[in-house]
Each structure stands twice: as structure tokens, then as C-alpha cells.
UniProtKB/Swiss-Prot annotation:
The keyword Ribonucleoprotein applies. PROSITE patterns: RIBOSOMAL_L20. PANTHER family: 39S RIBOSOMAL PROTEIN L20. This is Large ribosomal subunit protein bL20. Belongs to the bacterial ribosomal protein bL20 family. It comes from Rickettsia prowazekii (strain Madrid E).
Length: 117
């Protein structure tokens, strides 16, 4: 029985890893042994940061809302509590967008919520 060699498969696997390592610095973009480590670590970072991105954006929205609300004499926690009491169901993403791009619309929401403090 003849020996089964894996030439084509190895070549395909190497090519796939080196394609993922394109743009890396040093030997990481052309040396398979180094590239496979860097690609695996890069994929770990990507997996972790897809989850962290949700956390980071929520924090950013809260900071923007807080800054805009303080101009109207409230703090973030009071504002969010008043929104809930007023029955206004707008998420933080939309509120932050209004605070940055539509000051008049955001001001009217703040006035409506002030009535329920």
C-alpha cells in the first residue's frame, strides 16, 4: 500500500492561515509557524472584543446622555427614573443620538420627564 501524502491539504491549510495573517508585521505575515500563533491570538481578541464593544457603546451612550441632561439641570439617574415614570420607552442609543444631533427634540423629552420627578 502506498503512503498517503497530504501535500495539497497542507498547502491549502497554510494558504488559508497566511491569508488571514495578511497585513501582520515581521515574520507573522509570511512564516507559517509564527503566523498561526498570531492568527489564533487575533481571533481570540476579535471574539473578546465583539462582546466588549456592546459594553463600551452602552457606556458611551450613558456619558452622552448624562452630559446633555446636566445642561438641563438634572442628573442621569434622575432623568432615567423620570422617563420610566412618564412611560417614555426610548433606549439609550436613541437618546444619545438625539442628545448629540437634535437638541430641540432632546430638550422636549427632558421637559416631559421633569414633570414626573
Amino acid at each position: 500500500m502506498t503512503r498517503a501524502k497530504s501535500g495539497k491539504i497542507s498547502k491549502k491549510r497554510h494558504k488559508k492561515i497566511l491569508k488571514l495573517a495578511k497585513g501582520y508585521r515581521g515574520r507573522a505575515n509570511n512564516c507559517f509557524r509564527v503566523a498561526i500563533e498570531k492568527v489564533e491570538k487575533g481571533l481570540q481578541y476579535a471574539y473578546r472584543d465583539r462582546r466588549n464593544r456592546k459594553r463600551d457603546f452602552r457606556g458611551l451612550w450613558i456619558q452622552r446622555i448624562n452630559a446633555a441632561v446636566r445642561e438641563h439641570g438634572l442628573i442621569y439617574s434622575q432623568f432615567m427614573g423620570a422617563l420610566k415614570k412618564a412611560g417614555i420607552n426610548i433606549d439609550r442609543k436613541v437618546l444619545a443620538e438625539l442628545a448629540v444631533n437634535n437638541n430641540d427634540g432632546f430638550a422636549s423629552i427632558v421637559q416631559q420627564s421633569k414633570a414626573h420627578i
